[in-house]
Regions:
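Substrate-binding cleft of secreted/luminal carbohydrate-active enzymes
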Residues: 86, 91-117, 134-205
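Detector for Asparagine
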Residues: 21, 29, 36-39, 65, ...
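P-loop/Walker A phosphate-binding loop and immediately adjacent motor/lid segment at beta-alpha junctions
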Residues: 26-59, 117-149, 193, 198-205
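Polysaccharide-binding and catalytic clefts of secreted carbohydrate-active enzymes
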Residues: 1-102, 111
Length: 205
């Protein structure tokens, strides 16, 4: 569970109490870092008057719902029980950062197509929209342009177009961020090329 001997030593030395487990200790360390960045940016703004928005782009699955996974969350998303969770596997309590106002915006990496059955784009996008509304956090959706044409579930050239249209249903979604910039360049594969045409046609309307 602990990949490096040094980290185990640090855990035993720096945990806040004898009953604090490794997972909570790691999450706490990440929380401190995020909070400190937030506080430093606030100090800078008060001195210079120049505001910088601080955001995070987390893995799309924060926590799976308890109806699907025992160690999940009662407000979690509905996806495959074995899917990686940002909270438990990456030790990142994004919801806490949003709720505490430590981040100005969030860009969940919803790098899944509509076609995928175990983890779907529409379910996760709707879930993040609700969470952003609850916490009053600016929301952009991270979309996997780089995946277009990469495997059997990414063969629909209108996937990005359909995702953009789906996003428009939610007032809470302020925009989209494609990963990656280099994938906006044509000539990589026919599916992606056709997809870029549909995106351009949609955006210039």
């Amino acid at each position: 569970k602990i990949p490096y001997e040094r980290e185990e030593q640090d855990f035993l030395k720096y945990r806040t109490s004898a009953d604090q487990n490794f997972e909570d200790w790691r999450r706490s360390n990440v929380d401190v870092m995020i909070k400190n960045i937030h506080n430093e940016l606030k100090k800078s703004f008060s001195k210079t008057g120049k505001k910088v928005l601080f955001g995070i782009s987390p893995f799309a699955i924060y926590r799976t719902n308890t109806k699907v996974r025992e160690d999940g969350w009662d407000k979690g998303s509905f996806n495959a029980a074995g899917a990686l969770q940002c909270y438990s596997e990456l030790y990142s309590d994004v919801y806490k950062w949003m709720k505490e106002g430590w981040i100005d915006y969030v860009v969940p990496q919803v790098y899944f197509p509509f076609e995928r059955a175990d983890v779907t784009y529409h379910d996760l996008t709707k879930w993040w929209s609700n969470l952003a509304k609850e916490t009053n956090t600016i929301l952009y959706i991270g979309q996997a342009l780089y995946q277009m044409g990469s495997n059997e579930v990414w063969q629909n050239p209108k996937e990005m177009e359909n995702q953009l249209k789906f996003n428009c249903q939610f007032d809470q979604i302020s925009g989209t961020i494609f990963f990656t910039y280099k994938d906006l360049v044509p000539g990589q594969n026919p599916i992606k090329d056709e997809g870029l045409k549909t995106i351009k046609a949609l955006w210039v309307k």
